[in-house]
Amino acid sequence: MRNQDRPEHQTRGVLPTRLAAAGIAALMLSLAARASAEALGPPEKEDLKLGFIKLTDMAPLAIAYEKGFFEDEDLFVTLEAQANWKVLLDRVIDGQLDGAHMLAGQPLAATIGFGTEAPIVTPLSMDLNGNAITVSNAVWEQMKPHVPKMADGRPEHPIKADALKPVVESFKAAGKPFKMGMVFPVSTHNYELRYWLAAGGLNPGYYAPHKNDTDGQIDADVLLSVTPPPQMPATMESGTIDGYCVGEPWNQQAVFMGIGVPVITDHEIWPYNPEKVFGMTAAFVEANPNTAVRIVKAMLRAAKWLDENDNANRAEAVKILSRPNYVGADEAVIAASMTGTFEYEKGDSRDVPDFNVFFRHNASYPYYSDAVWYLTQMRRWGQIAEPKSDDWYMETAKQVYRPDLYRLAAESLIADGLMEASDFPDFDTETGFKPTQTGFIDGIDYDGTRPNAYLEQFSIGLKGDKQL
């Protein structure tokens, strides 16, 4: 899948005419941005192969391709769907792919050596939110008596795992394991599912890589296992799993098939949580710094396009994503979450305008605090087997997350007249750490500058000097 002809875009290198009247401060900022942009040379590598998994949050790649944003940067890109997250990561590491749509935990895990070890970096967050937890119809019927109701009789959201706990206990009493699927051991889905379960008093199990135990089921009340995203509905329908956590469109697919009910979105577990990132090897970035920045430029334009004017472009995006070479699901299924609504029980569609966020709320910025959160969850569930200092968390985050590349891309776009300084964080004051984050389903606040103190707040999970 590759464009053959370069589109005739005429906007590159043109500063908005209103800049002349903008005032001293704005002028100085623009001049600095222009200097940065002029320092950005031609791409070291023009022909690129980028990977993705068939999920709606690969959208920035599809839009950057379809709208000619890659070619505006003299990049000629082939987008290639991958079978699963492991294959995708391995192909980036061995150079078959130049970069890819990745789980936020993948660059971190690869860098610290959980799983395949290789230095991977990310200069861009691809989206916020976008996942949900779905259970089978049979499980939902057993959960419903434990779910509070609104005045109109519909379930009150968010639905906590407290309502699932009696169901899990009934399975245990009958001698049956309760099984749920997630997409990869270092996926947001794994950590969100574990977070939700633990908040409801259910232990999702521990990993012990130092004992060669990478199943993550030690002491588990609920057995979690890996299933590729497109296979989730069929795997649940067959009875192999009783529920799952996945990105779209595979929760809405269960509703359309009439086989399951999404009970909670990840926005209800952790509002505006970081989801996917764009990952490349550190070696690729070192050898091709201009190429890396130009990739980020194209994807930033795509991310803004997806969110601008209150999601006005989402209907067009849905049509693009429904093509078989991208997500390949029915338009109606993709639109169910991409256009500002989300269907829980069949017929119970509710407004969820921020189910997918690609650009607003600084969604694309690679915050160190996001990286630290993922690392805390790796420690909490044993993927990081031994205690780590706060400094270790900070140093690892800064090794993997590359806001310096993001800034170069943003300043170049500003100089090109394609975006405004107001589209981005204030780079002169941005620390990379968000203010203390609230709204988690368990009521625990997160301060990314104090990872060990954060871990101490959990009743279920490893913390302090505890090891398996």
What positions do the PLM features span?
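Secondary-structure end/capping motifs
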Residues: 287-404
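N-terminal export leaders
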Residues: 9-21
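Sec/Tat signal peptide C-region and signal peptidase I cleavage site
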Residues: 33-37
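Short glycine- and hydrophobic/aromatic-rich loop-to-beta-strand nucleating segment
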Residues: 133-134, 277-280, 284-285
